[in-house]
Amino acid sequence: MKYASFIAAAAAALASAVSAAGVSGSAEGFAKGVTGGGSATPVYPSTTDELVSYLGDSEARVIILTKTFDFTNTEGTETSSGCAPWGTASGCQLAINKDNWCTNYEPNAPTVSSITYNKAGVLGITVNSNKSIVGQGSAGVIKGRGLRIVSGAKNVIIQNIAITDINPKYVWGGDAITLNEADLVWIDHVTTARIARQHIVLGTQADNRVTISNSLIDGRTDYSATCNGHHYWGVYLDGSNDMVTMMGNYFYYTSGRMPKVQGNTLLHAVNNYFHNIEGHAFEIGSGGYVLAEGNAFQNVDAPVESPISGQLFSAPDATTNEQCKSVFGRACQINAFGSSGSFSQADTAVISKFSGKNIATAHLAQNIPKWVMANAGQGKL
């Protein structure tokens, strides 16, 4: 009887541990309602092949990462020609001549006869629908390869992991997280660092409902397109019918595209911390509709690049911000600045685009730097 009781107690404890493993909290903003793998029994991959299999199959899954999955050498290397469009100094990125990019777009750039890079990084791991990818503590790392949520995949959660070291010297060597024709995606408490090109990119097809929250885009790098140790290729939102909430993120030590917004993208940027950006943060092209409130900018050369071809409501002052009440049910929050450039444009037509949609909460910008630095990124759930 004692043995039976022990077994029952052990089984109960195991069941409790399993049920506790998985996603923490819930998404705010446009990805509200995302469930990922839901209540599926967690799986714990132990090899890179097993991780790829779990991410790409058709089952609803909660995938717990407990270690570093290093893809750097899993597919060997490739050698090709390239170019140096941003300079030949040791701190400048080089570009792989992928799809004849150098030939077609940078014909006058110095040529590089031989570039050797890791093949695995160029194309991310396919993530199918109904997946939760969750790191355990600070242990869950995907190194040398990114993730791709594309071609109709939906209902995906990526939480508490790091994606690092994807051919950082070479543009076109790979992106950390790619979405293209996806829906209901929540990226939360994710750290990205030392990436070839985009840390997060939403391609030209529609990515309907996306929330990027509490994440760290770490731009510190030995190789940069601006040759200054600040990564240029940050977040690129270019979809044909995209709704993106960015909240509580830490954008650090970058020099551009933080984010670049165009195509037909509605962006709510709220309570983010932009810090030590030698260059520009926002870049708003045609079809980019941005409402930015309650953000903090510290040592940011240009919070937004000029000219603005899309529309921006920058929550410029208390009186103007009252106009948010008709849609948000509250006034918008003023942004905060320290040793930063100007950020003031009031395209109030942007406000009405949020009507009937899930809108994230907003807090005072003055409190954001301390809060974000304590909470954004992997290991800070």
Curated annotation (Swiss-Prot):
<protein>
    <recommendedName>
        <fullName>Pectin lyase 1</fullName>
        <ecNumber>4.2.2.10</ecNumber>
    </recommendedName>
</protein>
<dbReference type="InterPro" id="IPR011050">
    <property type="entry name" value="Pectin_lyase_fold/virulence"/>
</dbReference>
<dbReference type="Pfam" id="PF00544">
    <property type="entry name" value="Pectate_lyase_4"/>
</dbReference>
<feature type="disulfide bond">
    <location>
        <begin position="92"/>
        <end position="227"/>
    </location>
</feature>
<keyword id="KW-0624">Polysaccharide degradation</keyword>
<keyword id="KW-0119">Carbohydrate metabolism</keyword>
<comment type="function">
    <text>Pectinolytic enzymes consist of four classes of enzymes: pectin lyase, polygalacturonase, pectin methylesterase and rhamnogalacturonase. Among pectinolytic enzymes, pectin lyase is the most important in depolymerization of pectin, since it cleaves internal glycosidic bonds of highly methylated pectins.</text>
</comment>
<feature type="glycosylation site" description="N-linked (GlcNAc...) asparagine">
    <location>
        <position position="130"/>
    </location>
</feature>
<dbReference type="GO" id="GO:0047490">
    <property type="term" value="F:pectin lyase activity"/>
</dbReference>
<feature type="active site">
    <location>
        <position position="257"/>
    </location>
</feature>
<keyword id="KW-0325">Glycoprotein</keyword>
<dbReference type="GO" id="GO:0071555">
    <property type="term" value="P:cell wall organization"/>
</dbReference>
<keyword id="KW-0732">Signal</keyword>
<keyword id="KW-0961">Cell wall biogenesis/degradation</keyword>
<feature type="signal peptide">
    <location>
        <begin position="1"/>
        <end position="20"/>
    </location>
</feature>
<comment type="similarity">
    <text>Belongs to the polysaccharide lyase 1 family.</text>
</comment>
<dbReference type="InterPro" id="IPR002022">
    <property type="entry name" value="Pec_lyase"/>
</dbReference>
<keyword id="KW-0964">Secreted</keyword>
<dbReference type="InterPro" id="IPR012334">
    <property type="entry name" value="Pectin_lyas_fold"/>
</dbReference>
<dbReference type="InterPro" id="IPR045032">
    <property type="entry name" value="PEL"/>
</dbReference>
<keyword id="KW-1015">Disulfide bond</keyword>
<dbReference type="GO" id="GO:0030570">
    <property type="term" value="F:pectate lyase activity"/>
</dbReference>
<feature type="disulfide bond">
    <location>
        <begin position="83"/>
        <end position="102"/>
    </location>
</feature>
<dbReference type="GO" id="GO:0045490">
    <property type="term" value="P:pectin catabolic process"/>
</dbReference>
<keyword id="KW-0456">Lyase</keyword>
<feature type="disulfide bond">
    <location>
        <begin position="324"/>
        <end position="332"/>
    </location>
</feature>
<dbReference type="GO" id="GO:0005576">
    <property type="term" value="C:extracellular region"/>
</dbReference>
